[in-house]
Curated annotation (Swiss-Prot):
InterPro entries: dUTPase (IPR008181), dUTPase-like (IPR029054), dUTPase-like_sf (IPR036157), dUTPase_trimeric (IPR033704)
Organism placement in taxonomy: Bacteria, Pseudomonadati, Pseudomonadota, Alphaproteobacteria, Hyphomicrobiales
Organism encoding this protein: Bartonella henselae (strain ATCC 49882 / DSM 28221 / CCUG 30454 / Houston 1) (Rochalimaea henselae)
UniProt key word Nucleus: no
Compositional bias segments (type: Gly residues): 173-184
UniProt-recorded name of the protein: Deoxyuridine 5'-triphosphate nucleotidohydrolase
Residues that, per the record, bind substrate: 96-98, 109, 113-115, 123
Length: 184
């Protein structure tokens, strides 16, 4: 039986971590993907290495089309794919580190979330944070997706605080944020 709120929180975290580890299948789960017409002929998302966490996503532009991203400009790039995720999972859309380092290209909504009940095309919102125009062509690896479990919670409202002595029942952080714990 937990003695404090901190003990209860720690027990909840340990139980959650244990359930995630024990629920990992011995075989990889299958991600069903539907290709749209403009996604035909492109490689399906795949892991670049045995230890990769993300599956590469490619631009599903037409052969004749090139999207030029000027510095500061953003564009929504189609992948030509619809994900059919299992309930209890999401697909996170993340930038590719090489594009960010070499060209300043990143995903604007990071990580983007594809919910398990979404059945539209997966698109990637890219922005050019670099100094030069960047050309996006058909088949380019533009982002990566990580499939992750989702923990849904029950939400309950707390009563308003009655006085200063009950404001911080766990820890001493209070309402501090955005660098309030230090800058080193």
């Amino acid at each position: 039986m937990p003695h404090t709120q901190t003990d209860a929180h720690q027990n909840n975290q340990e139980n959650f971590s244990s359930s995630l580890i024990s629920s990992r299948p011995s075989q990889p789960m299958t991600l069903s993907i539907q290709r749209l017409d403009h996604g035909q002929g492109l490689e399906l998302p795949h892991y670049a290495t045995a230890g990769s966490a993300g599956l590469d996503l490619r631009a599903a532009l037409s052969e004749e089309e090139t999207v030029i991203l000027a510095p500061g400009q953003r564009a929504l790039i189609p992948t030509g794919l619809i994900f059919h995720l299992s309930p209890g999972f999401e697909a996170q859309i993340r930038p590719r580190s090489g594009l960010a380092l070499k060209h300043g290209i990143t995903c604007l909504n990071t990580p983007g979330t594809i919910d398990s009940d979404y059945r539209g095309e997966v698109k990637v919102l890219l922005i050019n944070c670099g100094q030069e125009d960047f050309a996006i062509k058909r088949g380019m690896r533009i982002a990566q997706t990580v499939i992750a479990p989702v923990l849904q919670v029950n939400v309950c409202a707390l009563e308003p605080q009655q006085n200063e002595s009950t404001k911080n029942t766990v820890g001493n952080r209070g309402a501090g944020g955005f660098g309030s714990t230090g800058h080193d």
